[in-house]
């Protein structure tokens, strides 16, 4: 279609020349940012493809299985791909995990025991975790099972309260949960670099503590995971 035909189509939809020119100027101003996003997306796409190649994914892995799912080659290989892409020792990728909150509950309840302490050094987590942890009373919460919850709020500028974090860690601190997304708060979303710095600080204080990152919506937005 020639330019005149395209202009007529826009006009028929009520999109004026001024709006089209404004959109073109905006896209031009953001071109470098769009190119940077495309570069990250392309890199991560290659990373996923390599993970599939390294684990020799083929048509056989897409065949249905029956029974209890023992030796489910497709499921096991999918988890191997996830582990490769995210550089993990292993992965748990199952349709039985119904939501992010469900996955976090599994991780928390699987690692914490009565008398252990859970620390959030980035303030209060998502509202959906309040009943899981026991911030709001709930049957079956971690609090009900004797897990103690502590939090250290970020400073107003979004920086970590390292002094407060160090003071909150003790011999009973078993797991530190770090929520990457700002959730419903106004703080900045955490970068991989900042999370790494925080974990290094915590590990220097208590090397055996478990650091769990809720990556919520953060997958593939950087070249590092």
PLM ranges: what are they?
Residues 2-22, 31, 48-54, 61, ...:
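Conserved PLP-enzyme active-site core in the AAT-like
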Residues 24-88:
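Glycine-rich phosphate-binding segment of PLP-dependent enzymes
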Residues 79, 93-94:
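Short secondary-structure boundary micro-motifs
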